Amino acid sequence: MSTFGYRRGLSKYESIDEDELLASLSPEELKELERELEDIEPDRNLPVGLRQKSLTEKTPTGNFSREALMAYWEKESQKLLEKERLGECGKVAEEDKEESEEELIFTESNSEVSEEVCTEDEEESQEEEEDSEEEEDSEEEEETTEATKHINGTVSYNSVNTDNSKPKTFKSQIENINLTNGNSGRTQRNSESPAAIHPCGNPTVIEDALEKIRNNDPDTTEVNLNNIENITTQTLSRFAEALKENTVVKTFSLANTHADDAAAIAIADMLKVNEHITSVNVESNFITGKGILAIMRALQHNTVLTELRFHNQRHIMGSQVEMEIVKLLKENTTLLRLGYHFELPGPRMSMTSILTRNMDKQRQKRMQEQKQQEGHDGGAALRTKVWQRGTPGSSPYASPRQSPWSSPKVSKKVHTGRSRPPSPVAPPPPPPPPPLPPHMLPPPPPPPAPPLPEKKLITRNIAEVIKQQESAQRALQNGQRKKKGKKVKKQPNNILKEIKNSLRSVQEKKMEDSSRPSTPQRSVHENLMEAIRGSSIRQLRRVEVPEALR
């Protein structure tokens, strides 16, 4: 009866025209209907993350571009794939393989037990997990296809229909687009290869740098291969071979490049021949003591290298290698900077003294060159001065101007026959007056007063005063006769004591005061007890007892 009533209720909706009903709906009602239909039956061709529409009515505050996000994810995934291909993630892959092998061994050993314990419920749960994994794989494939759509810019999600034949046509469209876009997948990989080859950020292109070194390019004064981890030992050896004949490169850096002893030996052979490189950096590599000692032996034939860095190697050098390094570098006089921390104090101090000696020699050489240059310049200056003395120099003052008026003419004196009259002769001096009589002479002047005795000023030369006092004491001691068994007390002068006391420093006075034993201070009780011990009964006298004590 219930089903019959339900069908009777549905029969009244069969006569309704759907087109008229949809035409009568407003735009808002149509949007709401679309939302309801999407929730009831979502589009299976869309990935799971895009099936649910945004329910927020607010406008977005930031700029969000889904196409840019998908393109970024695509680039990152390609970079990861490229790293795996180049061996960046080799260690992680090996660890995963080891873990998987252990799991396989564990499952094989316990397979018999697991088969017995396994029940029907567990089998059903395993089947459900497999189904869910298959669904996730299909969803991931759909996401990748959506990413390719947005990158190529030819397919949109609005054009996706619910037909079953659509996936096949979609795949064919993608293949045609990739083939007819003008740039195939190979060119796309090549365009992204520089970023994938050097994920560390080093912009050096290995082949171009090697070609420039071989051609002796004048602009290439530094070769920087730092942090390029996918470079091989053969490539580093090729760089060392190319640098043997190069005369321009001054700095060669290959830190953190996984270089080993073979690369170090190639660098040592290069340093024996090259006389232009001044700095080598091989820090953070896999070089052992053998490779480092090979480089140190090469420095015995190299007189140009001033800086060498080989710290932070994978293997520890050890005390024997450090001692050998110091022994080999004793005869080197050009190395100024060594980038390595010695573990032993002995080699460390020896290496410090060697580097200090080399820096001092370089300074002396530089000073000598400056003196020679100044000497050449001084000799040339002396020659120019002597040459300038022989030539008349120009006056610093300007020449006087000519007067606008003509100078007066001086008439010449004509000597005639007439002689001039003689000049008058001076009269003779008068005779001296006669001497006066004795009673008319003036009294003689009084005799001059005797000169006052000069007061001897006190000199402040303390040393002279001390010498005088000591000489006086010696004279007194020599003049007096010493008596046997008697000591003569020396009573120095007060002035000498004051002078000696003034010459002593404050510290000496404090030391003298502290060296003297301090005088003991007795209390009243001690004085009383000492008096009682020293007294006797005869010395005591009778004393009346006071009334308060009676």
Swiss-Prot record:
What GO MF terms are annotated? actin binding; actin monomer binding; tropomyosin binding
**Chain segments annotated as coiled-coil in the UniProt record:** 91-147
| Source organism, top-level taxon | Eukaryota
Subcellular compartments: Cytoplasm, Myofibril, Sarcomere; Cytoplasm, Myofibril; Cytoplasm, Myofibril, Sarcomere, M line; Cytoplasm, Cytoskeleton
Region ranges (Interaction with tropomyosin alpha): 1-47
Q: Per the record, where are the segments of Polar residues compositional bias?
A: 151-164, 170-193, 391-402, 468-479
> According to the UniProt entry, which residue ranges have a biased composition of type Basic and acidic residues?
84-94, 359-377, 497-515
**Residue span of region Interaction with actin 1:** 1-165
Region described as Disordered: spans on this chain: 84-202, 359-527
Domain WH2 as annotated: residue spans:
524-543
Q: What InterPro entries does this protein map onto?
A: LRR_dom_sf, TMOD
The protein's matches in SUPFAM superfamilies, at most eight in alphabetical order, are given as: RNI-like
Note down the stretches annotated as region Interaction with actin 3: 524-543
Spell out the GO cellular component terms annotated for this protein, sorted alphabetically and separated by semicolons: actin filament; M band; sarcomere
Q: Where is composition skewed (Pro residues) in this entry? A: 421-452
Organ and tissue specificity:
Detected in neonate heart (at protein level). Detected in embryonic heart and in pharyngeal arches. Detected in adult heart.
Composition bias (Acidic residues) maps to 95-105, 113-145
Per UniProt, which keywords does this protein have? Actin-binding, Coiled coil, Cytoplasm, Cytoskeleton, Phosphoprotein
Q: Where is this region: Interaction with actin 2?
A: 166-500
| GO terms, biological process | actin filament polymerization; actin nucleation; pointed-end actin filament capping; positive regulation of actin filament polymerization; sarcomere organization
Give the observed phenotype of the deletion mutant: Mutant mice are born at the expected Mendelian rate. All die between 15 to 33 days after birth due to early-onset dilated cardiomyopathy. Cardiac muscle thin filaments are shorter than in wild-type, both in embryonic heart and in pups 6 or 15 days after birth. Hearts appear grossly normal at birth, but after 15 days, they display enlarged left ventricles with thin ventricle walls and resuced systolic performance. In contrast, there are no differences in thin filament length in skeletal muscle.
Q: What does this protein do?
A: Mediates nucleation of actin filaments and thereby promotes actin polymerization. Plays a role in the regulation of actin filament length. Required for normal sarcomere organization in the heart, and for normal heart function.
Q: Which family does it belong to?
A: Belongs to the tropomodulin family.
The protein's name in its UniProt record = Leiomodin-2
